C-alpha cells in the first residue's frame, strides 16, 4: 500500500514546557485531616439526631412525624442553599466558607439545647445547623477535588472517615452526657466539641500555593512550521487590494509576522460602514453592562448545567439516594428500641457497628474502584442494590446478634453511597463547574428531601409499621436503578461501538 505525503507537512516538532498540576497528595493530606476533624464533630450530628433529641421531642408531644419535620427542614436548608454555598466558595475561598460553616454548626447546636417546642428545633437544628453543614460539605469537597485528580475516590473516602469515627464514638458520648448532664447540658457540651471543627477547616489552604511543577513535552503547531519552511505568510496592509497576490517573505519577517498573526485589519470602507450603523454609545454601554451582569450570575451558579438531561438525571438520582440513607439513619435507632426492643446500650452498639463497617468500606472500596477503573455511577448502582437487600432483611429481625451482623453489612454498603455522591456529579462536568455542580446537586436534594422525608415519616405513623417505612425507603433506591441503568447501558454500548470504529483506523495508520 502506498501513501502520498504532503510536501508542506513537516515532522512533529516539540518543546519542553513547565506545567503546574495538582499535587495529588502533599498538603492535600492535611486538607483531608482537617476535613475529617470537622466531620467528626459536625457532620456526624446527622446520625445522632434521634439519640440526642428523641426524648425531648416525645416530651414536646411529637413522634416520628415530628422528628421527620425537623430533620427534613435541616436537609432542606443544607441542600437548598447549595448554589449559594458554591457561589460563596467561588467569591471567597473554600477555607473561609468551611470556617463560617463550622461556626454556624456550633451556634445551632448550642441554642438547640434551649428548645421548648418543635419550632425552636426547626430554627436551631434545622436552619442554623443546616447552613453550617451546607457550607462545610460544599467547600471541603471542592478543596479535596482541587488537590486530587488520580486518587480522588480514596481522598474523599479518607476525609469521610472522620464522619465514621464520629458515628462510632459519639453515640456512647451522647449516652453518657444524657445520663449525667441531661438534654440541655448535652447540647452545650456538644456545641463545644463542634467548635473544634474550626481548627480543621483552617487547614484548607488554597491549592495554588501547593501546585506541583512538571516538565512536559508539547507538540508545536505544525501549520506554523509548514508556513515557515515554505516562507509563506499573509502580509497585513492598511488598504489591501483583494486582487493583489500575497508576496513571499524571508524567514526573519516570517517569525515577526507569526508573533502578530492574531491581528485583524479591515478596510476603511468597512470601518466607515460599522461607524454609521453602530447604535448609540450610551445605550450600547447600558445593554453591555446588563448583559455582563447576567452572564456573571449565569456562570456563577452554573446554569448551563441544567441544559444537560444526563446531569439532571444524575442529581435527582443522588438526591433520592441521600434522602433514603438519611431517613434510614433517623428511623434505625427508633426501630432498634421500639420494634426490636433493644436498650440504649445495645442500640448504641448497633449504630457503632454501622459506623465501623462504613469506615472500613470507605477505606477499601475506593481503592478497588480506582484499581479496576469503575465509574462512580456504577459503584453507586451496585451499592444501592446491596443496601436494598440488606435493609429489607434487617427490617424483619429482632435478635440482637443478627442485627449486629446486618448492621455491619449495611454500613459496609452504605459507605460508597456517601463517597461517590459528589464524585458522580463532578465526573460529568468540567473542573471549573464543580462548585456550581455540587451546589445544584445539593439544591435538588433540598427540593426532594423535605416532602419525601415527611411522606416517609407519615407512612411510619399511619401504618404503625417500621417494615413499611423501610420498604418505602428502599423504593427510592429502586427509582434510582430504573432511571440510571438504561442510561448507563446506553453509554456502555456507545463506548463499545466507538472502540470498534477506532480499531480499523489504528490498524490502517500502522500499515
Which stretches of residues belong to each language-model region?
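Extracytoplasmic gate region of multi-pass secondary transporters
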Residues: 45-56, 296, 301-366, 452
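C-terminal transmembrane helical hairpin of 12-TM major facilitator-type secondary transporters
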Residues: 315, 324, 339-342, 346-348, ...
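Conserved MFS/SLC helix-loop-helix module at the cytosolic interface between two early adjacent transmembrane helices
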Residues: 80-119
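Intracellular juxtamembrane helix-capping segments at the cytosolic ends
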Residues: 56, 133-148, 155-156, 416-429
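Helix-breaking motifs and short loop linkers at transmembrane-helix boundaries and internal kinks
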Residues: 61, 93, 114-116, 148-149, ...
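Helix-to-loop junctions at the C-terminal end of transmembrane segments
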Residues: 81-94, 361-375, 460-461
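Long, low-complexity inter-transmembrane loops of multi-pass membrane transporters
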Residues: 1-20, 24, 199-316, 343, ...
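Hydrophobic core of transmembrane alpha-helices in multi-pass small-molecule transporters
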Residues: 40, 108, 119-135, 319, ...
